[in-house]
Amino acid sequence: MIVYLAHDLKTPLTSVIGYLNLLVDEPQITPELRARYTGIALEKAERLEELINEFFDITRFNLTTLVLEPERTNLTRMLEQLASEFAPVLAEHGLTIRSTLAQGTEILCDRDKLSRVFDNLLRNAVNYSYPDSEILLTLEKLEQAVKIVVQNHGRTIPPEKLSHIFEQFFRVDVSRASATGGSGLGLAIAREIVELHGGQICAESADETITFMVVLPVQGL
C-alpha cells in the first residue's frame, strides 16, 4: 500500500515542482506562458489535494467503523448542484451534461458521504469520456428505492477489467489514470458508502459506453 501511496502522490507533486521551477528560473517568461504554467501547477496541486483526501478516507475505512449521519435529503437538488459545479471542468474538456432528474426526490441518507459518491462518478465520467461528447445523469423513482445513472461515451472497458473496477487501487487504464491524477481509490470508496446505505452500485460497459448505476432505498438507515 505504501508503494501505491508514494507513486500516486509523487506524480502530481513532481509536476507542481517542475512548473514552479520554470517560473522561478525564467524571469523573462511571457505573461501568456506564466499564466499557463501557473494554471497547470494549480490544477496539479488540486489533484494532489484530492489524492490526500482519498487516502485519508480509505485509511479511515480500513481502521474504523464508518458511522453514517443520516438526514432527509433532497437528492434532486444535490445532483443538480453537483452537475452545476462540474460546468468549468466539462467546458475544459468540451463535454456537456444532460440531466433527467425526477423532481422532489427525497431519501434518508448521509448527505456529505453520498455527495462524495456522485462527485466521484461524475469525475470518473469526465476523465474517461471522448472529447466533445455527452454525459448522461438520470434520477428515477422506483417503488421503494431510487436509481441514479451516470453514463458517458468512452473506450469500452473489457469484462475482465470491469469485474475488478470497485477494488482498491484498481485502474482500468494505468497510463490515463496517471495523467488524470487518479489513485484507484475513488470507486472503492463509492461502493463502501453505497453499501453502508443499504444500496447497490454496479458498472456496465459495451459499444463505447460506460454506465454506472446506483440503487438506494428511500428509507432504510
Question: Positions of the model-derived regions?
Answer:
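A conserved beta-strand-to-alpha-helix junction within the catalytic ATP-binding
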Residues: E69-S84
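Short alpha-helical Gxxx[C/S/T] motif in the catalytic ATP-binding
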Residues: G186, A190
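Short beta-strand/loop element within the Bergerat-fold HATPase_c
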Residues: D132-Q144
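Short helix-loop "hinge" at the ATP-lid/N-box region of the Bergerat-fold HATPase_c
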Residues: A125-V126
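Short conserved segment of the HATPase_c
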Residues: I157-R171
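Conserved glycine-rich
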Residues: G198-G199
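Conserved catalytic submotifs in the C-terminal HATPase_c
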Residues: E69-R72, A91, T96-E106, L142
